[in-house]
């Protein structure tokens, strides 16, 4: 087994370990949480992370790690792990099944491996640079279900997820810009999905169930996963500073990008 094979296996195992904790709490109705004006923190975040960290640290004690709850662990070498024990905390606390445990691994700052496990549905995505995306073990691509959105570039029937970073609602100017982006998309596509679980909806894009994904000031915990799932699934992507767009094909990307450029912000 190569180093990258082992990293991929450990990332998947860590995501599954966190997911097992979340699944047990979700089924028991244990969604205890502290609610703020713009965010929510569930006890399950800490519990799931406590299951994930030993998997990673036990296998690679010298690697740098950022865990959403525990913070930074210094390390040597080119690898850095990003652990998000509960992506979609608001949905989890509300009893919605759209949440996941995710792990990303960067090599020299670039996404190398991503693993996402959705406990409520038992779905697992694993992506690796140069190796594509696997959904429950099978290779998938963003173009697999293109017909759901019509012909290439025909976004009138498209479903597009919009993801904003945690700082956006706290800043009136950024919040207004995000609203303008949503409004512009709403006038152009069939459905704008306001995503509170970026890794879940990134997986849907990776297998063509969504036609587009828009991220505005994305959070680090999810962005590495999103980028790797999109690129390895063959999605068309474009970034300009704090705006990132991925789509099932180049024509759809061009239409979405043009729509966002014309937004009143």
Kindly label every feature range from the protein language model:
Residues 24, 28, 141-142, 165-168:
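Acidic/histidine-rich helix-loop elements
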Residues 22, 45, 56, 89, ...:
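Residue-level signal for inorganic ion chemistry
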Residues 75-137:
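DPxDG-like acidic metal-binding loop motif
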Residues 132-135, 139-141, 251-255:
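Short helix-loop capping/hinge motifs at secondary-structure junctions, enriched
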Residues 33, 73-75, 108, 152-154, ...:
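Solvent-exposed alpha-helices and their adjacent loops that cap or buttress functional pockets
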Residues 1-86, 261-265:
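N-terminal subdomain of lithium-sensitive/metallo-dependent phosphomonoesterases centered on the IMPase/IPPase/PAP
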Residues 148-265:
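An extended, acidic
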Residues 46, 69, 85-88, 92, ...:
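Generic detector of well-ordered alpha-helical packing
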């Amino acid at each position: 087994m190569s180093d990258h094979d082992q990293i991929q296996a450990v990332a998947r195992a860590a995501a599954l370990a966190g997911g097992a904790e979340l699944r047990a709490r979700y089924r028991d109705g244990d969604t205890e949480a502290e609610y703020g004006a713009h965010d929510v923190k569930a006890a399950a975040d800490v519990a799931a992370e406590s299951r994930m960290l030993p998997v990673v640290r036990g296998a690679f004690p010298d690697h740098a790690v950022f865990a959403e709850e525990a913070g930074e662990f210094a390390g040597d070498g080119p690898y850095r792990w990003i652990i998000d024990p509960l992506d979609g905390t608001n949905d989890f606390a509300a009893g919605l099944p759209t949440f996941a445990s995710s792990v990303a691994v960067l090599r020299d700052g670039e996404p190398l491996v991503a693993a996402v496990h959705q406990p409520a549905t038992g779905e697992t995505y694993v992506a690796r640079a140069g190796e594509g995306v696997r959904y429950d073990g099978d290779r998938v691509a963003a173009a697999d279900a293109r017909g759901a959105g019509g012909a290439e570039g025909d976004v009138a029937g498209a479903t597009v997820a919009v993801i904003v970073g945690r700082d956006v609602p706290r800043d009136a100017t950024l919040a207004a810009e995000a609203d303008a982006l949503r409004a512009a998309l709403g006038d152009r596509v069939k459905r704008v999905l306001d995503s509170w679980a970026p890794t879940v909806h990134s997986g849907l894009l990776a297998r063509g169930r969504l036609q587009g994904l828009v991220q505005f000031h994305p959070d680090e915990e999810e962005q590495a996963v999103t980028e790797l799932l999109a690129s390895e699934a063959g999605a068309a992507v474009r970034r300009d500073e704090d705006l990132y767009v991925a789509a099932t094909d180049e024509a759809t990307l061009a239409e979405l990008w043009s729509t966002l450029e014309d937004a009143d912000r």
